[in-house]
Amino acid sequence: MYLYNSATHKKEEFIPNDPSLVKMYTCGPTVYHYAHIGNLRSYIMEDVLEKYLRYVGYPVKRVMNITDVGHLTSDADEGDDKMLKGAKREHKTVMEIAKFYTDAFFEDCRKLNIKRPDIVQPATGCIDEYIKIITKLIDTGYAYFSNGNVYFDTSKLDKYYIFNEHKEEDLAVGVREGVEEDTNKRNKNDFVLWFTKSKFEDQALKWDSPWGTGYPGWHIECTGISLKYLGENLDIHCGGIDNAFPHHTNEIAQSESYIGHPWCKYWMHVMHLNTASGKMSKSKGEFLTVSLLEEKGYDPLCYRLFCLQSHYRRNLVFTWENLDNAAGTYQKLIAKVAALKNDGGEIDNEAVATLRERFNAALGNDLNTSLAVTALYDVLKYKTNDATKLFLLDDFDKVLSLDLIKKADEVRKRAAAAAKPTAGVYSILAEEGSEDAEVTAKIQARYEAKKAKNFAEADRIRDELKAQGIEITDIPGGARWKRI
């Protein structure tokens, strides 16, 4: 398998430190608000990576943090604590909103078939680890105390910028409009390891430390949690491209200064989800949630497919038209799977080998999910029996997680029920001698599209059936079809 490594700016063969266990770390959400679908794009792609590693035989231990303290409204060290700001907004305690939005995040993940990491660690649960690391960084000259805070001294590093080749003056540290810069730093890019009450008098969460009562900075959290659960030799660190600088840059600086050797072999960054007005952002108040997609009639897995149709290293443009197209593609794909006959035939091992090779060629080349989706259509078109096709679709879906077999079974059940007119149930009636599972599945898909107010997709299915010589007549509670 080859994976693009953001730290070296090239695709590299994936060779873990220890093949018996791949150690993978994911930057989790700051739980002061709902995750928007741009955030969730990153988690979808990281989910595919983990599942593909397992698919090709690697055991994986994946750890994710939950930031419930220390992440300021600027990605640098300025502004308000996001958790405190969220608590004030909703008139709740910090821990109340942390629990609420953590639960909401994992509910969104469930709807998108994103596997829960093996270990999920709230940042507030590892204070002792942060203090231990900071103490050593001070003792070894990599950190200093200034006006109530402990800072990492970036001037002590031979190389600070890892994920880009820009000069220092070309990079913005992420100080947003209306946010004052921290004048306690010795150097522009120094960052806080520990805040004391000198920063925010009304900070809700504080702990005793050698430097006074306070709380950890954002960056030290991921270092402490990763080292605690995954040790000093990390294989893969994932996150959105927003995290590359300064967050991941600072993680590397403090982690390698603490352990005294290289820390993580591969860095994976997922690019932005953009709208017509630019990058989706909670700070601008412009964001869409999974719940909103559902309210508009979309299956969340349509959004998962939408993400899979684009490479993770390309910015993806969200429009409702683009999502409609993905929803139509998803419904058609399920209809094709539903038309396959689960007759228990023998598996064609030669076809399995050929088609798996195509699937692996796609995902093994820097996680090309677009080609992996194409591999599903290769299965459907391949000249082999339905049992083999169903086996392969189920096999590939262990990685893509589109619920193809489950959704197809639901379509078949609805189609079977529709053949028996019942009050309140959508019925599909065929002229005598014209029963056809594929036609029934397509008519059912047309009904689902109409129910979701995706009328363009419903019309497309009607036109497609008409071109095949199938005439549909809508009737109360269902539809009747015949060949013409």
Features from the language model and the residues they span:
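Alpha-helical recognition segments enriched in aromatics with Gly/Pro capping
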Residues: 1-32, 47, 107, 127-341
